[in-house]
């Protein structure tokens, strides 16, 4: 019986350690190295392995990594524990990192108004320029700079709490590049620049891509460093069969894996303990399975506990000294310098960042300022470092400017007011002035329309703009029949001062042409107006389609045909569109939408306030109101309040309950303006798709009238 027990124990031991080098002998006081392979999201398995090593107190003397292995390995070498890295992984939205979408709250005021395109195609030298990747990696810079701030002053990676190296591939020569010195964030960016997903990274005079192209499993490099025992985490799953190759990423992965499979076999000769987690059904982009992947690494590492227990132990509990987060990493920035800028000067760059010199900054505050600069869309990528120069702290910015000036842009949209529309746009940057932009939209579909916008952005110094638009639309009665058809053309010239890209104040003059037709009697009417106006605008909403926080304000005072009327005849209007978004919980947001419009001596039907319809375009004095047809009711004055309770689930899905109340009235002479004459309830199901919003709404007036079913697809234009 005893012999049988020994036999089965030995058999289990052999089965468990088939990934352990044959005849492995552990010398006295061995040096232990950790080799972490690349594999995108599969690299989260490394974290599970690190947690096991930490729980046993294993002393690691050197770390090498490629791609995601470089990211995890770099964090570990910098003093983070396995649990620390697990927390980082679980709290990071990797899809958001890859999307590299601008933070809308920081986007320039002009760009917020033209945020409506699905496809953007740069034109250079008369030719279409295809993007080199999905993302430039700008958000990766923010994240890595923040994570590695405690070792940002260490240029020699052998001086880190655990010596470290990472592998990248020189894009021009195809040769392996081993990074052991320099900016650790930049080196890791180069090692993880997966082709087609992220732009190549320029360091010095060379450009680099993912190290997996040459050595994905850098075990041999550790042996060359004198490491006795190399513990490796192998993420290679071999080549896929045709039934598993279903996307561009799958095809690219398969091609890259041709070389990885061969090189990994070579690296196994230098790996003493090869930990190979079970990653069946998981791939480089399985970021939503990070918990499962992390657990697979932890489970696999537990099989090697008996061997790990024979290895040297740490004589300390932590590698990083705990730091008070309130006072940590605060730098006095005395000056700034910019490298590689040929189009935009230092003053423009510092101004857009709103950087005051000298001032105290953290890596987090610098990241936020760079986000403002990046949101101008004038730069492909912006890197930075804090350096010492003449006993001063200097913020060194290295920029890669977007030299493209011409763009073609396209969009699609459907709503119940303007029906279907295909948007084609031409955008020209730096026309006459470096800080200028011209945008020309043509909408082709059921209701053709055009928009022209030219603006010189001088920040808080007033800039000049020209705007023009033209459109046609039908007004409907409560029986859903069109009773009027309008053509409206507007041309504006204005000056505008912008503060922090959140507020704009200015004034101008507009020229309106109206052509209206009564579809019942056939009567036609045409009027023209020259109107001076002033305005105050604000926009800090985090999303145009499904905002969760921030506000929107548009307050305008306009005098109609001011230059043609006597003082007694002059007509004025004051209107305010005010919206606020207030997060109640992580998933629930209260959204307030209010509109106030007042008329003095108004005599034109074209400038009355019209209530009804679901739309978000700027259409004269038409006001959105659920449960009523577009332009169903009108009068000289209006008060409306919309209350939305927006519930967000499964990241991009929404359910919105709405209660709207309002009033239209002729004057303020009696108490009628305090009455609620219009009210409705509505329910919306929405999806924030890569192609814009998808909304299905059912709204019902609280009066005795039929409900209205509406569909909205795509960005508003």
Where are these regions (language model features)?
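Bacterial Sec-dependent N-terminal signal peptides
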Residues: 1-25
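Patatin-like phospholipase
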Residues: 19-66, 74-371, 375-387, 393, ...
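Acidic/histidine-enriched alpha-helical segments
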Residues: 240, 309-324, 509, 550-553, ...
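Gram-negative/organellar outer-membrane beta-barrel architecture
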Residues: 364, 369, 383-543, 614-623, ...
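C-terminal outer-membrane beta-barrel translocator/porin domains of Gram-negative envelope proteins
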Residues: 410-412, 532-537, 541-650
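Short glycine-rich beta-strand segments
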Residues: 469-473, 510-514, 556-562, 597-601, ...
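C-terminal hydrophobic structural anchor segments
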Residues: 646-678
């Amino acid at each position: 019986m005893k012999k049988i027990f020994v036999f089965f124990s030995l058999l289990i031991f052999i089965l468990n350690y088939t990934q352990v080098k044959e005849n492995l002998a552990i010398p006295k006081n061995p040096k232990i190295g950790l080799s972490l392979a690349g594999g995108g999201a599969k690299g989260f398995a490394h974290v599970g392995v690190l947690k096991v090593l930490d729980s046993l107190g294993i002393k690691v003397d050197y770390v090498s990594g490629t791609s995601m292995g470089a990211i995890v390995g770099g964090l570990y070498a910098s003093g983070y524990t396995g649990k620390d890295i697990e927390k980082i992984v679980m709290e990071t939205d990797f899809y958001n990192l890859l999307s590299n979408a601008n933070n809308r709250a920081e986007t320039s005021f002009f760009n917020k108004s033209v945020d409506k395109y699905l496809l953007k195609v740069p034109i250079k030298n008369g030719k279409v320029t295809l993007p080199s990747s999905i993302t430039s990696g700008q958000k990766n810079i923010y994240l890595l700079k923040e994570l590695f701030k405690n070792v940002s002053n260490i240029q020699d990676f052998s001086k880190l709490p655990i010596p470290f190296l990472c592998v990248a591939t020189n894009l021009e020569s195809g040769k392996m590049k081993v990074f052991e010195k320099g900016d650790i964030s930049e080196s890791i960016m180069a090692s993880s620049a997966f082709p087609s997903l992220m732009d190549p990274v320029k360091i010095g005079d060379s450009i680099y891509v993912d190290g997996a192209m040459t050595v994905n499993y850098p075990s041999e490099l550790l042996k060359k460093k004198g490491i006795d025992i190399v513990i490796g985490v192998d993420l290679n799953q071999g080549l896929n069969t045709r039934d598993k190759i279903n996307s561009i990423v799958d095809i690219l992965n398969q091609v890259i894996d041709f070389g990885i499979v061969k090189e990994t076999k070579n690296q196994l000769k230098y790996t003493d303990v090869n930990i190979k987690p079970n990653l069946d059904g998981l791939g480089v982009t399985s970021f939503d399975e990070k918990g499962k992947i992390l657990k697979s690494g932890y489970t696999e590492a537990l099989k090697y506990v008996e061997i790990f227990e024979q290895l040297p132990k740490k004589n300390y509990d932590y590698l990083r000294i705990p730091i008070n987060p309130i006072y940590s990493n605060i730098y006095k920035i005395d000056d700034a310098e910019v490298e590689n800028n040929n189009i935009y000067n230092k003053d423009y760059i510092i101004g857009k960042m709103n950087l005051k010199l000298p001032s105290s900054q953290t890596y987090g505050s610098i990241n936020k300022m760079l986000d403002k600069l990046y949101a101008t869309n004038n730069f492909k990528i912006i890197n930075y470092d804090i350096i010492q120069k003449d006993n001063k702290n200097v913020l060194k910015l290295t920029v890669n400017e977007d030299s493209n000036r011409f763009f073609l842009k396209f969009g699609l949209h459907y709503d119940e007011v303007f029906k279907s529309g295909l948007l084609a746009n031409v955008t020209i940057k730096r026309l006459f002035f470096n800080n200028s932009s011209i945008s020309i939209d043509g909408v082709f579909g059921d209701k053709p329309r055009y928009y022209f916008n030219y603006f010189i952005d001088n920040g808080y110094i007033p800039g000049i703009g020209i705007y023009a638009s033209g459109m046609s639309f039908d007004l409907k009665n409560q029986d859903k029949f069109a009773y009027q058809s309008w053509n409206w053309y507007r041309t504006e010239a204005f000056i505008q001062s912008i503060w922090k890209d959140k507020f704009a104040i200015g004034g101008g003059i507009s020229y309106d042409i109206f052509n209206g037709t009564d579809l019942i009697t056939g009567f036609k009417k045409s009027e023209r107006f020259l109107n001076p106006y002033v305005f105050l605008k604000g926009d800090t909403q985090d999303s145009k389609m499904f905002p969760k926080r921030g506000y929107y304000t548009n307050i305008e005072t306009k005098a109609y045909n001011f230059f043609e009327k006597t003082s007694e005849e002059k007509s004025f209007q004051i209107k305010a569109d005010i919206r606020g978004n207030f997060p109640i919980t992580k998933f629930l947001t209260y959204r307030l939408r209010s509109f106030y419009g007042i008329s003095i001596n108004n005599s034109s039907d074209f400038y009355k306030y019209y209530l009804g319809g679901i739309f978000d375009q700027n259409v004269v004095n038409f006001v959105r109101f659920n449960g009523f047809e577009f332009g169903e009711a009108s009068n000289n004055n209006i008060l409306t309040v919309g209350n939305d309770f927006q519930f967000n689930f499964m990241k991009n899905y929404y359910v919105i309950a709405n209660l709207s109340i309002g009033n239209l009235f002729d004057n303020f002479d009696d108490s009628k303006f305090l009455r609620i004459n219009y009210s409705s309830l509505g329910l919306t199901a929405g999806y924030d798709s890569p192609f814009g919003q998808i909304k299905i709404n059912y709204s019902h007036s609280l009066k005795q009238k039929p409900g209205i079913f509406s569909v909205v697809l795509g960005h508003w234009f």
